[in-house]
Curated annotation (Swiss-Prot):
InterPro entries reported in the protein's UniProt record: AP2/ERF_dom, AP2/ERF_dom_sf, AP2/ERF_ERF_subfamily, DNA-bd_dom_sf
Name of protein: Ethylene-responsive transcription factor WIN1
Gene Ontology MF annotations: DNA-binding transcription factor activity; sequence-specific DNA binding
Subcellular location(s) per record: Nucleus
Keywords, sorted A to Z: Abscisic acid signaling pathway, Activator, DNA-binding, Ethylene signaling pathway, Nucleus, Stress response, Transcription, Transcription regulation
Keyword ATP-binding: no
Biased composition (Polar residues): 70-80
Function of the molecule: Promotes cuticle formation by inducing the expression of enzymes involved in wax biosynthesis, particularly promoting very-long-chain waxes formation. Confers drought resistance. Acts as a transcriptional activator binding directly to promoter regions of CER2, CER3.2 and KCS1, wax biosynthesis-related genes. Binds to the GCC-box pathogenesis-related promoter element. May be involved in the regulation of gene expression by stress factors and by components of stress signal transduction pathways.
Ranges annotated as biased composition (Low complexity): 159-174
SUPFAM superfamilies cross-referenced by the UniProt entry: DNA-binding domain
Organism: Zea mays (Maize)
Domain of life: Eukaryota
Length: 213
């Protein structure tokens, strides 16, 4: 009878995202990095709620306003997401952690897990509505956003693609500012795609550039 009551107590607690219970009763929290596709260990906690709040903190640090959390996200005066941590949160890597200390600890664990973190996810993309092709980037972090790094307009005359790429490279970065490694790679990706899609000799027909992503 006692064993049945004990097993029921183990099943009753609400299930939280990124939280699981050990056989001896403690709760552990871990989160999967959205870009690196690997799990980050967040620690062991006394209650499921504390573990869930630690998960929420890590989710906001990695995904910002797009984070999927267990509890509602509070907004600061600047509009940034700030999930509140439990008052009595204690883990195996810090005892009596405050909200600020918990955020610092989680940030340190994420940096340690990702020794060479990838700040963004970059890929070639075609935008048929605006008739251009370019490099699209999604950043990770507390201020996660997505934007076009650079674009090349799809002209009807395939012979003008070289001029379009040159004008685009001239407008993407100021002349006085050296091109960083990320922009250089992005521009190289576009130039290679344009050169592989251009015909051997220009013609005045109705052919238009076709790009396959």
């Amino acid at each position: 009878m006692t064993e049945n009551l004990h097993s029921r107590k183990m099943v009753q607690p609400k299930k939280f995202r990124g939280v699981r219970q050990r056989h001896w009763g403690s709760w552990v929290s871990e989160i999967r990095h959205p870009l690196l596709k690997r799990r980050v260990w967040l620690g062991t906690f006394e209650t499921a709620e504390e573990a869930a709040r630690a998960y929420d903190e890590a989710a906001v640090l990695m995904s910002g306003r797009n984070a999927k959390t267990n509890f509602p996200i509070q907004r600061s005066s600047t509009g940034e997401p700030t999930p509140a941590a439990g008052r009595d949160a204690r883990s195996n890597f810090s005892s009596g952690s405050s909200t600020t200390n918990l955020s610092q600890i989680l940030s340190a664990k994420l940096r340690k897990c990702c020794k060479a973190p990838s700040p963004s996810l970059t890929c070639l993309r075609l935008d048929p509505e605006k008739s251009h092709i370019g490099v699209w980037q999604k950043r990770a972090g507390a201020r996660a956003d997505s934007n076009w790094v650079m674009t090349v307009e799809l002209n009807k005359d395939a012979a003008s693609t070289d001029a379009a790429s040159q004008s685009t490279s001239a407008t993407t970065a100021p002349p006085a500012t050296p091109m960083d490694e990320e922009e250089r790679i992005a521009l190289q990706m576009i130039e290679e795609l344009l050169s592989s899609s251009s015909p051997a000799s220009p013609s005045n027909g109705d052919d238009q550039g076709r790009f396959i992503i």
